[in-house]
């Protein structure tokens, strides 16, 4: 610390002293406290530095200090204290200790030294005549109150001048002649008193009360015995008040997460020892193999620091977001003022999970082959394809599709199904056929079985013996199969169950055969699906039904067919079935952006109110991903209104997610649908306007204020308004916007402006009443401070410069008239309202509609705001309006031949490049409000008729009166 002090190393910067006096006043080399000094004469050296941190400065009302200022090497069981030594000298001496500042230039400090040998804030100790080491075991530091700094400092300077204690160094260079002690009751003249007063006034403004240094000065006796021979003073390392927020040791106490995604932006709660909210950073760093260091900083504002002990921040993006394995880094607190850091803690960046909904994973599963439908395996009997995908002969085992399971039944092979007759003692068979049953002709038919069982209509097995019951016959009707079983013993009941399966299998085989015939005739795949519609409720290993999988694989026509064949009794169960991630088919349709499938599912009765595993409804998912087309379809449903203000598992409404995704179209849809723009998210009470300010998105903030009538002074749970956040983050544009919308810069939040424990100077003056923090208190720059005090916002460029960029005047009036007519057509894709959105003036559409000629008003406003023909052509190109483009090209072709400077490059790349020059790289200029910051204030766009720029708003319940002026 001391060796880096600019004062100790650059004497020419101290008070601009006369070079002839520099050597006599002091030599900077003697200020190296731990270094042997290159001189043959006496000099002063620091043997033990004071401990820099952990010692508390005490106020008068707190009483004396408990223990003296410890030394740097002091330990619990081995105390040490600051020590100095007078080298190259043996004899009597006097050493004085003064408190000085820690700034670039050393001055007297207003705090006082107290303890043994201390008087008037100065410690005086005698040394020698043999032991020239002087220790200071009982030094305390008395903290002066802010109100008494000037008074104390002036008295301290006067005393230093009277006694000759370094007045030229510590007070003013013009007082350097008052050096030697022995002046006694030296009287100071008016000029000297005025110099002292001016120095005290100046230093009072600059003094840091949380840090001091010790300045040791030794005096040796002269020939008369008076201590007038001054040795060069030495200055200790800085001593920080342990009660000062910017002086305490930085320490991370707890974090709720120690890992995050490489993309950053994940919220972490960090508990720490006391910090100063405007003087702290959260630093992530990694030491690279080549010796370099990567670092990133957590994103938070002063409003995210709670009572100096907790910080809520968002993680920074890692240097490489394409890593395939986790990367270990460190996180630490760092103070801005002195770059002091805490002990680092490990943090893990893991690769980005791009498929959180597992849609891509399921799409990448092995697709079934056509040959798989014929079954496989081996067996002793005849093979063949089967309805259940099994094959082989008798005794062979079949293969079902992956993820599905069907029971293996032991029956003889029939129609491709493997049956095994040896599972029971009976060799019961089955009769089938038409009215002329073949079983009567077959001597080996099933009616010749010895043991018989009868199955009644209720599925119960009735046991009889051959003596009790006559052999039964199998009767077969047209299209029916009736089984009659011979009775047997109780042990043969398993065979009856096998026979039941055989009966059902035969019925199923006939149904599938008929469906196949119908499909061959009609070519309609629904004929095949209809006989299997009950199987649509089957789920695979991920819980997905066939409807889920059809949506995942983007088979929209198959989804329609499935919805049609399952309509009826079981449709509700299937259409709202959830997989293992609690996703319904409607959730997946929204995630995969299939607008037509969303419409089909809603028509079929899909339930909008069902939530996924994270509590997200389909409105949340659409807003989160910025799918405005899907969101528009969902909002038309009658149940959508009930979900507009429903929070998800993170306490966020759909409008909050639209803000976080920076989607202006989604925000406009939600506002138009009636979403509550003042709704608070449930974690900290932020509204959509708070989130817009946090994301520094002036377009969304302007939309909320102008279109949504958002409450400009809405508060979070701790009383923070959007203006608090804008001021704390230093955003001049948003501060100007909010101030123009009527935000109050004097609103206090619940965060105390200062800590009572650190403000003993207020004792006795309304003790316990601490004001909150206002946006003015949080202003991080003078520009923001001036805006909050009513000074007009001044952009970095001038209006004249922007006017020079506009070239709309080159279009003749007849050309403009043709454009007006083309833009007045009712086609919503080609009218003036769509063009306004493309030109970044969509926020003013409601105002344009008030004009008798909206298209003319739009073009006039665009021209006055510095618009260019290039931007206009590009906007029309995006609309696909070739007729309007041809009108402009035809009018501009003569100009092109005469002046290359006014040519119209119609290349999209070049046009976009010109547009981007007027836009910030980190935001989208499409709300109109943002355009007003980059171009001329649009108050000049209309000079007659209804004003388009003073947007009259509905009366507010929260006290905002009058119109919201467009000029900021």
Curated annotation (Swiss-Prot):
Residues found modified as Phosphothreonine: 943
Residue window of motif Nuclear localization signal: 360-365
Annotated site, Cleavage (when cotranslationally processed), chain positions: 433-434
Keywords, alphabetical: Acetylation, Activator, ANK repeat, Apoptosis, Cytoplasm, DNA-binding, Hydroxylation, Isopeptide bond, Lipoprotein, Nucleus, Phosphoprotein, Repeat, S-nitrosylation, Transcription, Transcription regulation, Ubl conjugation
Record note on domains: The C-terminus of p105 might be involved in cytoplasmic retention, inhibition of DNA-binding, and transcription activation.
Illness: Immunodeficiency, common variable, 12, with autoimmunity: A primary immunodeficiency characterized by hypogammaglobulinemia and recurrent bacterial infections. About half of patients develop autoimmune features, including cytopenia, as well as generalized inflammation and lymphoproliferation manifest as lymphadenopathy or hepatosplenomegaly.
Protein name: Nuclear factor NF-kappa-B p105 subunit
Organism encoding this protein: Homo sapiens (Human)
């Amino acid at each position: 610390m001391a060796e880096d002090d600019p004062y100790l190393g650059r004497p020419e910067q101290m008070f601009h002293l006369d070079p002839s006096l520099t050597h006599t006043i002091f030599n900077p080399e003697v200020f190296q406290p731990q270094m042997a000094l290159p001189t043959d004469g006496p000099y002063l050296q620091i043997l033990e530095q004071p401990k820099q941190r952990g010692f508390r400065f005490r106020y008068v009302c707190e009483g004396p200090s408990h223990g003296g200022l410890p030394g740097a090497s002091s330990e619990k069981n081995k105390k040490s204290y600051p020590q100095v030594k007078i080298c190259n000298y043996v004899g009597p001496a006097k050493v004085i200790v003064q408190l000085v500042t820690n700034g670039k230039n050393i001055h007297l400090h207003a705090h006082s030294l107290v303890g043994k040998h201390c008087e008037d804030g100065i410690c005086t100790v005698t040394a020698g005549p043999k032991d020239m080491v002087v220790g200071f075991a009982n030094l305390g530091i008395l903290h002066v109150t802010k109100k008494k700094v000037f008074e104390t400092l002036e008295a301290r300077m006067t005393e230093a001048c009277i006694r000759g204690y370094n007045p030229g160094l510590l007070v003013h260079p013009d007082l350097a002649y008052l050096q030697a002690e022995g002046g006694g009751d030296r009287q100071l003249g008016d000029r000297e008193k005025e110099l002292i007063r001016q120095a005290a006034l100046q230093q009072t403004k600059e003094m840091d009360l949380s840090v001091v240094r010790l300045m040791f000065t030794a005096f040796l006796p002269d020939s008369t015995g008076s201590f007038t021979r001054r040795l060069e003073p030495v200055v200790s390392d800085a001593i920080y008040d342990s009660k000062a927020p910017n002086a305490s040791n930085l320490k991370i106490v707890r974090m709720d997460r120690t890992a995050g995604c490489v993309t950053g932006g994940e919220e972490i709660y960090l508990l720490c020892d006391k910090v100063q909210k405007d003087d702290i950073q959260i630093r992530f760093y990694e030491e690279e193999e080549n010796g370099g260091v990567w670092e990133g900083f957590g994103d938070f504002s002063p409003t995210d620091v709670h009572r100096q002990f907790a910080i809520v921040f968002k993680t920074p993006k890692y240097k490489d977001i394409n890593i395939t394995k986790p990367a270990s880094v460190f996180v630490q607190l760092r103070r801005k003022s002195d770059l002091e850091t805490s002990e680092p803690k490990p943090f893990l960046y893991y690769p980005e999970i791009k498929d959180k909904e597992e849609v891509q994973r399921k799409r990448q599963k092995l697709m079934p082959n056509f040959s798989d439908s014929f079954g496989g395996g081996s067996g002793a009997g005849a093979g063949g394809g089967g309805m259940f995908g099994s094959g082989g002969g008798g005794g062979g085992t079949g293969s079902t599709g992956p993820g599905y399971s069907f029971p293996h039944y032991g029956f003889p092979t029939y129609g491709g199904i493997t049956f095994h007759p040896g599972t029971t003692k009976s060799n019961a068979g089955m009769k089938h056929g038409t009215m002329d049953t073949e079983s009567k002709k077959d001597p080996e038919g099933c009616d010749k079985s010895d043991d018989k069982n009868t199955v009644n209509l209720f599925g119960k097995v009735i046991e009889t013996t051959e003596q009790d019951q006559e052999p039964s016959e199998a009767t077969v009707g047209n299209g029916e199969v009736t089984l009659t079983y011979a009775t047997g013993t109780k042990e043969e009941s398993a065979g009856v169950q096998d026979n039941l399966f055989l009966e059902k299998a035969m019925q199923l085989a006939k149904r599938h055969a008929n469906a196949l015939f119908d499909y061959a005739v009609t070519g309609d795949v629904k004929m095949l699906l209809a006989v299997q519609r009950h199987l649509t409720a089957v789920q695979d290993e991920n819980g997905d039904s066939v409807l889920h999988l059809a949506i995942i694989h983007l088979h929209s026509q198959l989804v329609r067919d499935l919805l049609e064949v399952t309509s009826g009794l079981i449709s509700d169960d299937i259409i709202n079935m959830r997989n293992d991630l609690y996703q319904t088919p409607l959730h997946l349709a929204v995630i995969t952006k299939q607008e037509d499938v969303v419409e089909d599912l809603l028509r079929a009765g899909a339930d909008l109110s069902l939530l996924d595993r994270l509590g997200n409804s389909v409105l949340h998912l659409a807003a989160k991903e910025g799918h405005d087309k899907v969101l528009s379809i969902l909002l038309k449903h009658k149940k959508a209104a009930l979900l507009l203000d429903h929070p998800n598992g993170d306490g966020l409404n759909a409008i909050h997610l639209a803000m976080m995704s920076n989607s202006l179209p989604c925000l406009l849809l939600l506002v138009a649908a009636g979403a509550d723009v003042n709704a608070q998210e449930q974690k900290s009470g932020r509204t959509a306007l708070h989130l817009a300010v946090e994301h520094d998105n002036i377009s969304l903030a302007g939309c909320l204020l102008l279109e949504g009538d958002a409450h400009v002074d809405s508060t979070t749970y701790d009383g923070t308004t959007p203006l608090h956040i804008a001021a704390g983050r230093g955003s001049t544009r948003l501060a100007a916007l909010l101030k123009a919308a009527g935000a109050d810069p004097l609103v206090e939040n619940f965060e105390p402006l200062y800590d009572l424990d650190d403000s003993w100077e207020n004792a006795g003056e309304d003790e316990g009443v601490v004001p909150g923090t206002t946006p003015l208190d949080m202003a991080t720059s003078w520009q923001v401070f001036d805006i909050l005090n009513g000074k007009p916002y001044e952009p970095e460029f001038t209006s004249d410069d922007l006017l020079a960029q506009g070239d709309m005047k080159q279009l003749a009036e007849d050309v403009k008239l043709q454009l007006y007519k083309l833009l007045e057509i009712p086609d919503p894709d080609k009218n003036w309202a769509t063009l306004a959105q493309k030109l970044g003036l969509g926020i003013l559409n409601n105002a344009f509609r008030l004009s008798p000629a909206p298209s003319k008003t739009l073009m006039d406003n665009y021209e006055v705001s510095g618009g260019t023909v290039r931007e206009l052509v590009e906007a029309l190109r995006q609309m696909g309006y070739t007729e309007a483009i041809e009108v402009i090209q035809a009018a501009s072709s003569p100009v092109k031949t005469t002046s290359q400077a006014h040519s119209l490059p119609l290349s999209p790349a070049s046009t976009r490049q010109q547009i981007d020059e007027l836009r910030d790289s980190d935001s989208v200029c499409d709300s109109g409000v943002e355009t007003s910051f980059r171009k001329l204030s649009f108050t000049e766009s209309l000079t007659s008729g209804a004003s388009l720029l003073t947007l009259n708003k509905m009366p507010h319940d929260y006290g905002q009166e009058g119109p919201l002026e467009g000029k900021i």
